[in-house]
Amino acid sequence: MDSNTVSSFQDILMRMSKMQLGSSSEDLNGMITQFESLKLYRDSLGEAVMRMGDLHSLQIRNGKWREQLSQKFEEIRWLIEEVRHRLKTTENSFEQITFMQALQLLLEVEQEIRTFSFQLI
């Protein structure tokens, strides 16, 4: 995994955790949790691709990986929509920058997961 992507995830998660969005802080915590889950999933797919010998055991052991992949894409789409909504509603420049970077990172991660999944098929 690219070290820039790791630091981008860490940076965005740290900045999002510092935000105070009033009554929607519960929603923000949910977004942070999903970001962390997405990062772990992307990392595990990347590791599976790097260890192609494990590919077949991964597919045999986990026959539901395509279903999980589909679920992750749904989560990414939900996060993208949520981040876009936050961008439209916030006037705070710190939040705007954070959510713009989060959106860019989500799009990059979506592409990486697609690339990994095509290699696994």
Curated annotation (Swiss-Prot):
Q: Which SUPFAM superfamilies match?
A: Nonstructural protein ns2, Nep, M1-binding domain
Q: What is one cellular component GO term in this UniProt entry?
A: virion component
Q: Which cysteines are joined by disulfide bonds?
A: none
The text of the family note is: Belongs to the influenza viruses NEP family.
Listed name of the protein:
Nuclear export protein
Gene name of the encoded protein: NS
Please provide the record's keywords in A-Z order: Host nucleus, Host-virus interaction, Transport, Virion
| GO biological process assignments | exit of virus from host cell nucleus through nuclear pore
What other comment is given for this protein?
Answer: Average number present in a viral particle is estimated to be 130-200 molecules.
Q: Where in the cell is it found?
A: Virion; Host nucleus
Q: What's the subunit arrangement here?
A: Interacts with protein M1. May interact with host nucleoporin RAB/HRB and exportin XPO1/CRM1.
List the ranges annotated as motif Nuclear export signal. Answer: 12-21, 85-94
Concerning Pfam families, the annotation shows: Flu_NS2 (PF00601)
Q: What does this protein do?
A: Mediates the nuclear export of encapsidated genomic RNAs (ribonucleoproteins, RNPs). Acts as an adapter between viral RNPs complexes and the nuclear export machinery of the cell. Possesses no intrinsic RNA-binding activity, but includes a C-terminal M1-binding domain. This domain is believed to allow recognition of RNPs bound to the protein M1.
Major localization listed first in the record, in broad terms = virion
